[in-house]
């Protein structure tokens, strides 16, 4: 991967090695209408939330001012992760196997469990990077599955 000289100068040796050894396994993107998610929540309530989102995600989204937008963003994130894996909803993967978490600054990250984690191990995915954005009408997400050498683990 080529980085312009001014960017390379800012990177530490560790970052340089990480960039050199990085491989892209897959990319995925998704967009969803927030109204669609709002209607699913209205129609199916707790059943829908419990089927699609983890307790941590429900707690986070429910505490937000625009909770529907946050639920829609997580929906789009889960879909984009599946696309980055290249599997769709096959191979024993469920909605709750993919969890969106946020650090103290709000940066989202992906935690994998169950079938999603197993598939990523088989694909030698070291990290699943995610970007989420939303407004009143739509939410979108972009996922990048980053590869690892066979000896590394996802932890």
Question: Whereabouts are the PLM-identified features?
Answer:
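Core catalytic alpha/beta fold that binds nucleotide/phospho-ligands
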Residues: 2, 14-155
């Amino acid at each position: 991967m080529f980085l312009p000289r001014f960017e390379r100068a800012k990177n530490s040796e560790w970052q340089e090695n990480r960039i050199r050894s990085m491989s892209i396994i897959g990319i995925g993107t998704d967009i969803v209408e927030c109204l669609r998610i709002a209607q699913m929540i209205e129609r199916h309530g707790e059943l829908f939330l419990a089927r699609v989102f983890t307790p941590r995600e429900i707690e986070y989204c429910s505490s937000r001012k625009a909770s529907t937008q946050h639920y829609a963003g997580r929906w789009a994130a889960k879909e984009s992760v599946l696309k980055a894996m290249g599997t769709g909803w096959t191979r024993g993967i469920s909605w709750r196997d993919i969890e969106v978490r946020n650090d103290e600054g709000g940066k989202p990250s992906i935690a994998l469990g169950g079938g999603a984690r197993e598939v990523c191990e088989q694909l030698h995915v070291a990290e699943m990077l995610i970007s989420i954005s939303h407004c009143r009408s739509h939410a979108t997400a972009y996922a990048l599955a980053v590869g690892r050498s066979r000896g590394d683990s996802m932890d």
